[in-house]
């Protein structure tokens, strides 16, 4: 039971900072389902949840083969989701569905940066971005891709006109 509480706490730290998340999601219960859990009750080290990982909180859904939470001096510093691919989806406050997939999704809490590595795709109503590496800076909202010798593909959708 104590291990389950630790896992819920660690995963909640991952989910609490997504910039465009539906704000009401943070106030809802979180459900975590997986085949296996291996958590440390210390201030330093890695804890993992593996096997058909499903994490849901409100409109946020995360699917992965494995989730690893890294703690340094008692604070969560990094969360790594891996899968074939790892997938995230969430509805924002405007009711728009946002999706992200990659072989590995790494969230650095200290720098508020998310790296999508390996077949990365971000889809949202305003457009999409695809590449081997996509970086998302939560503070600035900046998406960067490429620069590693691979190419990126982007699609920008026109702004919809308000109905009269």
Segments from the language model and where they lie:
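Mature-chain termini and adjacent capping regions
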Residues: 1-164
